[in-house]
Amino acid sequence: KGFTLVELIVVLVIIAILAAMLIPALTGYIDKAKNKSIIAETRSAVMAAQTLIDEEYGKTNVGKLEETEIPVEDIAELAEVDPDKISNFALNTEGTKVATLTYTDGKKVCTYNPDNKSSNSDGAYDVSKEE
């Protein structure tokens, strides 16, 4: 009236095979989600930096700004991230836009570069493993 031991073992083997096929696919989705997460954090830092650049330019309106006029600590505070995670912040030659910004979360590095043409990037955001 119940299942035999052989039938239960067959069911368990089938479940194990299905799980073995799904785990690599799920791992890929997890990696993509982690990449999207660091891109979102980097985008937040870039938007904060651009906001501060626009505010500073509006105050002075004297032309070119320098990176030193926009402290990384202010960018991190506005983006609500740790200032130690932001590096390589630079303005474009006109001093009016973010040219580059690198964000590190401890495992991966995301670099913002609007001129990026890399095929493995998400537009202006390039994610790589931390060295």
Residue ranges and their predicted role:
Residues 26-46:
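Aliphatic-rich helix starts adjacent to a transmembrane/signal segment
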Residues 42-59:
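N-terminal alpha-helical signal peptides/signal-anchor transmembrane segments
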Residues 60-113, 121, 130:
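Extracellular/periplasmic head regions of type IV pilus-like filament subunits
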